[in-house]
């Protein structure tokens, strides 16, 4: 015999939670806007303006994530109720178990949509840039920066985000000195914004012939891509623009022209650079776009003391600004802000970061 009342209570609970989300996420307005966007994308001349078409496509994906999920929730809950009625009438435990399994799947889907309420910031839905900088410590720190780069690239891949290496400076022996990665996808900045800070590694160094334990630091800094229509005034006199040859491993594909571009904003000391295109003009445009994004983020941080402290972390690679500790010898990774801890260090280094990110977002960091 199976208990039907607890399942009916769950259906009622999910129905109420869905209704709350419909209001909070403005379902009716989003559904109407989705119809408008679909109509625009069906126009034969829409691709005459590729940037606008791409923006509409991105908007459609974001709208569908809300509208389609809530539509599926409504239909799914009705279907589960129907299955339960059949199970009771036929006294069929197999049908009952099928209904419960469908209900479990619906609850997980709803929980994912509820989590999007964490993304309430103005730019949470934007694409973003991730800067990783090796701290002092030479080869060991540079290898750690490379491990972080791999970890974030794996994480982004697992979430279906697109990644692009904008600039990378290789280490002298191993690893990297720094890297800038562009991460594109739905709520990329919202997902990654709490990852800004210093990451501490403790391990027996493979670069130490004595096998001694070393502590290394690398910093991560996340900032949103700013739309071109955002008004950020940059005085050309405040900029120093340098061009240089693209670094590479050698061979016939090395770029022998000075196409790489580095831009320094003298008043703030902010530096952006790009070398991923053979065209100096395109690299300069990309570096200016990053500069605009960084200056916008700096303005946002001036209005928010907590974010300002986060920006300070970027230049303070040491004990005081750590967000996470990776102690590989003890098989322990711990987030120092939320207390979330795991023993599965390899999974985390392979990109399994959601438990840390979700906890920090829920904590309002």
From Swiss-Prot:
Sequence motif GGQ motif, location on chain: 250-252
SMART domains for this protein: PCRF
Impact upon substituting residue 246 to A: In strain: BL21 and MRE-600; increased termination efficiency
PTM annotation: Methylated by PrmC. Methylation increases the termination efficiency of RF2. Is absent when the factor is overproduced.
InterPro entries: PCRF, Pep_chain_release_fac_I, Pep_chain_release_fac_I_sf, PrfB
Effect of residue 205 to P: No longer forms a detectable complex with TnaC-stalled 70S ribosomes
CC per GO annotation: cytosol
Keywords: Cytoplasm, Methylation, Protein biosynthesis
Highest taxon of source: Bacteria
Residues the record lists as N5-methylglutamine modifications: 252
Subcellular location field: Cytoplasm
PROSITE patterns, alphabetized: RF_PROK_I (PS00745)
GO biological process: translational termination; viral translational frameshifting
A GO MF term: translation release factor activity, codon specific
Disulfide bonds: none
UniProt cross-references to PANTHER family, sorted A to Z: CLASS I PEPTIDE CHAIN RELEASE FACTOR, PEPTIDE CHAIN RELEASE FACTOR 2
Entry-linked HAMAP family: Rel_fac_2 (MF_00094)
Entry function: Peptide chain release factor 2 directs the termination of translation in response to the peptide chain termination codons UGA and UAA. Acts as a peptidyl-tRNA hydrolase. In the presence of truncated mRNA in the 70S ribosome, ArfA and RF2 interact such that the GGQ peptide hydrolysis motif of RF2 rises into the peptidyl-transferase center (PTC) and releases the ribosome. Recruited by ArfA to rescue stalled ribosomes in the absence of a normal stop codon. A TnaC-stalled ribosome binds RF2, but the active GGQ motif is prevented from engaging with the PTC by TnaC.
Family membership: Belongs to the prokaryotic/mitochondrial release factor family.
Subunit organization: Interacts with the ribosome. Recruited to stalled ribosomes by ArfA, in the presence of truncated mRNA, ArfA influences RF2 conformation so RF2 can hydrolyze the peptidyl-tRNA bond. Biotinylated tnaC mRNA can be detected in a stalled 70S ribosome-RF2-TnaC-tRNA(Pro) complex.
More about this protein: The gene for this protein contains a UGA in-frame termination codon after Leu-25; a naturally occurring frameshift enables complete translation of RF-2. This provides a mechanism for the protein to regulate its own production.
Record-given protein name: Peptide chain release factor RF2
The encoding gene: prfB
């Amino acid at each position: 015999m199976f208990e039907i009342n607890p399942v009916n209570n769950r259906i009622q609970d999910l129905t109420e939670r869905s209704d709350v989300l419909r209001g909070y996420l403005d379902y009716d307005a989003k559904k109407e806007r989705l119809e408008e966007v679909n109509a625009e994308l069906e126009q034969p001349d829409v691709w005459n303006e590729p940037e606008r078409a791409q923006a509409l496509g991105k908007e459609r994906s974001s709208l569908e994530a809300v509208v389609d999920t809530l539509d599926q929730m409504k239909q799914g809950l009705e279907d589960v109720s129907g299955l339960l009625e059949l199970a009771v009438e036929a006294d069929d435990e197999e049908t009952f178990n099928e209904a419960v399994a469908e209900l479990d799947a619906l609850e997980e889907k709803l929980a994912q949509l509820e989590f999007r309420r964490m993304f309430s910031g103005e730019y949470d839905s934007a694409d973003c840039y991730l800067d990783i900088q090796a701290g002092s410590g030479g080869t060991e720190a540079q290898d750690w920066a490379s491990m972080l780069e791999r970890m974030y690239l794996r994480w982004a891949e697992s979430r279906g985000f697109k990644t692009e290496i904008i600039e990378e400076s290789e280490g002298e022996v191993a690893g990297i000195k720094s890297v800038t990665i562009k991460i594109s996808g739905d709520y990329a900045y919202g997902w990654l914004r709490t990852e800004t800070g210093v990451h501490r590694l403790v391990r027996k160094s493979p670069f130490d012939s004595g096998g001694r334990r070393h502590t290394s630091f690398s910093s991560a800094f996340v900032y949103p891509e700013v739309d071109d229509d955002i008004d950020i005034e940059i005085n050309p006199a405040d900029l120093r623009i340098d061009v240089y040859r693209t670094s590479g491993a050698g061979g016939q594909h090395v770029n022998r022209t000075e196409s790489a571009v580095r831009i320094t904003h003298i008043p703030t000391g902010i530096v952006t650079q790009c070398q991923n295109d053979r065209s100096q003009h395109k690299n300069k445009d990309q570096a200016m776009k990053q500069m605009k994004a960084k200056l916008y983020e700096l303005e946002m941080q001036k209005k928010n003391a907590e974010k300002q402290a986060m920006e300070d972390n970027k230049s303070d690679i040491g004990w005081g600004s750590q967000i996470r500790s990776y102690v590989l010898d003890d098989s322990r990774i711990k987030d120092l802000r939320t207390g979330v801890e795991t023993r599965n260090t390899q999974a985390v280094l392979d990109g399994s970061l959601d438990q840390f990110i979700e906890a920090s977002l829920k904590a309002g960091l």
